[in-house]
Regions:
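ATP/NTP phosphate-donor binding region
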Residues: 1-71, 269
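Accessory alpha-helical/coil subdomains and C-terminal extensions
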Residues: 2, 7-11, 27-38, 151-243, ...
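Short beta-strand segments
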Residues: 7-9, 81-83, 107-110, 142-146, ...
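Short acidic, glycine/serine/threonine-rich loops at helix termini
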Residues: 16-20, 92-93, 118-121, 151-157, ...
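Short Gly/Thr/Asp-enriched flexible loops that form oxyanion-binding sites at enzyme active sites
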Residues: 81-104, 241-249, 280
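Short, acidic/small-residue loops that bind anionic groups at enzyme active sites
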Residues: 92-123, 130-136, 254-265
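Internal gly/pro-rich beta-alpha loop/helix module
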Residues: 108-178
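C-terminal non-catalytic interaction/assembly regions of soluble proteins
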Residues: 236-337
Length: 337
């Protein structure tokens, strides 16, 4: 019988109405008791890591999660992480970079309604996640929700309240869990490299979303206080003329100091390509800017957090590692440009 470790972190799935709003109260051991049928499918053991609203998720907890999987990796056949939906995409992306080449599945799931509520989606999501974690062809970090199995680096929350809360961005859904069966859409290619854990990460990463009329002094502040800024630009990517002087003044100092600017787009689908327009092409070539292409923002942020800790001040090494595909995170990068 397969052994699955259920790791509780809180979220809506663990919440109860406390008079001043839903609050995580149920432990993972209590949650699994709502789906007693899974006890006949596998041996489930429980680890309660924390019990928080996922709005309060923090990189320190990602480190604790990754270390918990590392410590128990040889003891279990799969792992299921119970999590709130609001930051679930960040956590599934972070774990994808912190636990690479895992032949064992690490499934992140939760629900839009508490598990003790009538008509909740929690029981189905938990059952589907355990079924997927038991399967011999499952591996690496995935997010399972509303029957969809999404690569951990490609998930994004698209609905605030509906059960079909998550979509896979710029990459196909890996599989569906339906009526107790797993329907896979991609051919199975087993991991051949040994599992690697990168449990230490940097939180010196900031996202800066451009709006028409953005003030240059905001960039100066971010450049002074963070080691990496992910800039969400417009369309396929570019920097407004009003910001160019600030960017040019800062970039050389940044590279010398081992700091980084990564360009992304506010447009969710199809990704960036700074080579198309003048507002993007020149600054990218002048400074060999790192570009996010078709990655999700959650993947960009968490990948940078992991890489900053691994490569420190080496711009070339970090750029090379950023463009290296991890768990289907980037498909259209052209690092030679």
């Amino acid at each position: 019988m397969k052994k699955i470790l259920l790791i509780g972190t809180g979220g809506t799935i663990a919440s109860k109405e406390m008079g001043d709003g839903l609050t995580p109260e149920l432990a993972a051991k209590e949650i699994v008791s709502y789906v007693p049928e899974v006890q006949n499918l596998c041996a489930i053991e429980v680890l309660q890591l924390c019990n928080i609203d996922s709005t309060n998720m923090h990189p320190k907890i990602w480190t604790e999660l990754a270390k918990a999987v590392q410590k128990n990796f040889d003891r279990y056949d799969g792992f299921v992480v119970l999590h709130g939906t609001d930051t679930m995409a960040y956590t599934s992306a972070a774990l994808s970079y912190m636990i690479q080449h895992s032949r064992k599945p690490i499934v992140v799931t939760g629900s839009q309604q508490p598990i003790d509520r009538e008509g909740t989606d929690a029981r189905v999501n938990l059952r589907d996640s355990i079924l997927y974690a038991m399967d011999e062809y499952s591996e690496n970090v995935v997010l399972v929700f509303d029957g969809n199995v999404i690569a951990g680096t490609r998930a994004k929350k698209m609905q605030a309240r509906s059960f079909n809360a998550f979509q896979s961005v710029n990459f196909p859904v890996l599989a569906r869990v339906q009526d107790g069966r797993i329907i896979r859409y991609l051919p199975y290619i087993p991991e051949r490299e040994p599992v690697r854990f990168y449990t230490e990460i940097s939180d010196s990463v900031c996202v800066f979303k451009l709006i028409p009329g953005t003030r240059p002094e905001l960039l100066s502040y971010l450049f002074a206080n963070y080691d990496c800024v992910g800039m969400e630009s417009f369309g396929v990517g570019g920097i407004p003329d009003a910001l160019l002087d600030t960017v040019y003044q800062a970039m050389q100092k940044w590279k010398e100091a081992g700091k980084f600017l990564v360009m992304a787009t506010q447009v969710m689908n199809e990704g960036s390509n700074m080579e198309i327009y003048r507002v993007g092409q020149k600054v990218k070539k002048d400074f060999q800017l790192i570009e996010a292409y078709d990655m999700t923002l959650e993947a960009v942020v968490t990948k940078l957090m992991v890489l900053l800790k691994r490569y420190g001040s080496s711009y070339e090494e970090l750029q090379k590692a950023f463009y290296a595909e991890v768990n289907h995170d980037i498909l259209c990068a052209f690092p030679e440009q």
